[in-house]
Design a protein with these regions (language model features):
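Extended polysaccharide-engagement surfaces of secreted carbohydrate-active enzymes
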Residues: 84, 90-178, 227
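Solvent-exposed beta-strand/loop surfaces of large extracellular or lumenal domains
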Residues: 1-21, 207, 251-267, 290-302
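Extended, loop-rich substrate-binding clefts of extracytoplasmic carbohydrate-active enzymes
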Residues: 142-222
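Beta-strand-rich recognition/accessory modules
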Residues: 11-29, 285-344
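Alpha-mannosidase-like glycoside hydrolase catalytic domains involved in N-glycan trimming
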Residues: 1-67, 71-73, 77, 82, ...
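Acidic (Asp/Glu-rich), glycine- and aromatic
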Residues: 215, 221, 226-260
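Short, hydrophobic/aromatic-enriched beta-strand segments in well-ordered soluble domains
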Residues: 34-44, 199-203, 319-331
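Primarily extracytoplasmic ectodomains and periplasmic/lumenal surface modules that are beta-strand-rich
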Residues: 3, 43-45, 94-95, 99-103, ...
């Protein structure tokens, strides 16, 4: 009857074709314990979807978008070089019952933000018109919400770069470029279910300024949270690089806040009318590991990577770094117009 059943899903985390994780979400008070009983059933229950991952692609300018779960993009397959945008919403999107995001797979590798006004999942045709063509139809208000964030040449909310004492290296390129600095970009939806959706990105032979790196990224979203978890891992580091995680500041008038939350996290937070045309209140934050945090810097106002705060984190080869990106929009919850409410 659903009253005593915790929504769950089984996941294949090592991609061997067999499930190895039973995943569910539960609320706990501090030091609270709960008894959960595992019962095998013949038929898997169908639960309300509280997370989703979506990706669509058209194979030519004249063919309709079709759903897909994976993609390989080569350096010469940017919109500027092939003459059209091949990806629905410029790349994959993921959401939960609170908020949504999208990743610009088209070489830019920035993270954009969908504000949501409903707990239901957004329609499958977001970013596609009636003819099946890629179309920017999400910068206007719908019943479910809309794209609310101006990204420009930043990396959006939770995108990242590498930084040294002398240079800032963007993973990928801008909308004006026709050749990527990443030789091969691979993407796949690892899992999509009612309580967890996960995406994987790999970047092979990223070559900024005479260097060569490979990068692996896992993006995870679960219900009930106004954000997502990101795990990134680098190979090819020379030793002078730090990770730089972005918090876009194109429409900011109010200063960034740095909160020393506890022994695990540092929070970089902004709260402002920082949506498109500065129409609504929006709080955004990065939660980064305290033992890796090296302070923050601000990107230039022009160039390949601009208009963003950057949290600097210590890096080592093949060591995963985990951080969280969070946002609260006043039309999702009117209380997000209050900076103290968002902060707390």
């Amino acid at each position: 009857d659903g009253k005593d059943t915790i929504p769950s899903q089984i996941n294949d985390t090592d991609n061997d074709g067999l499930w190895d994780e039973l995943f569910f979400v539960a609320n706990f008070k501090p030091k609270e314990s709960k008894n959960v009983q595992l019962i095998w059933v013949d038929k898997a229950p169908v639960y309300v979807s509280r997370t989703s991952a979506r990706f669509g692609k058209r194979s030519s300018a004249d063919t309709p978008v079709k759903p897909a779960t994976k993609e390989i993009m080569l350096a010469n397959e940017l919109p500027k070089s092939i003459g059209y945008q091949q990806y629905q919403t410029d790349g994959p999107s993921w959401e939960n019952d609170k908020i949504g995001f999208r990743h610009y797979l088209d070489g830019r590798n920035a993270k954009d933000l969908f504000g949501k006004k409903t707990s239901k999942m957004s329609p499958e045709n977001v970013g596609v018109n009636a003819k099946g063509e890629v179309e920017d139809n999400y910068h206007v208000m719908h019943d479910w919400g809309r794209d609310i964030l101006a990204v420009g040449n930043s990396v959006g909310l939770g995108g990242y770069a590498l930084i040294t004492n002398t240079e800032l290296m963007r993973l990928g390129v801008t909308v004006d470029d026709s050749i990527n600095n990443v030789e091969k970009t691979t993407f796949q939806i690892i899992q999509e279910g009612p309580v967890k959706s996960e995406l994987e990105f790999t970047y092979e032979n990223w070559k900024p300024n005479g260097r060569t790196y490979s990068v692996k990224e896992i993006t995870t979203i679960v219900p009930g949270k106004y954000g997502y978890k990101n795990t990134v891992e680098f190979n090819g580091l020379k030793g002078d690089e730090n990770l730089a995680v972005g918090l876009v500041n194109i429409n900011n008038n109010l200063p960034i806040q740095i909160i020393d939350q506890n022994d695990k996290f540092i929070i970089l937070l902004t709260h402002d009318k920082q949506t498109y045309t500065k129409e609504w209140w929006l709080g955004m934050a990065l939660l980064v590991p305290k033992n890796k945090y090296l302070g923050y810097t601000e990107a230039p106002e022009t160039g390949k990577l601009s208009h963003t705060y950057l949290a600097k984190l210590k890096l080592q080869n093949r060591e995963p770094i985990v951080y969280y990106a969070v946002a609260g929009w006043e039309l999702s919850d009117v209380k997000f117009s209050d900076p103290e409410y968002f902060k707390n």
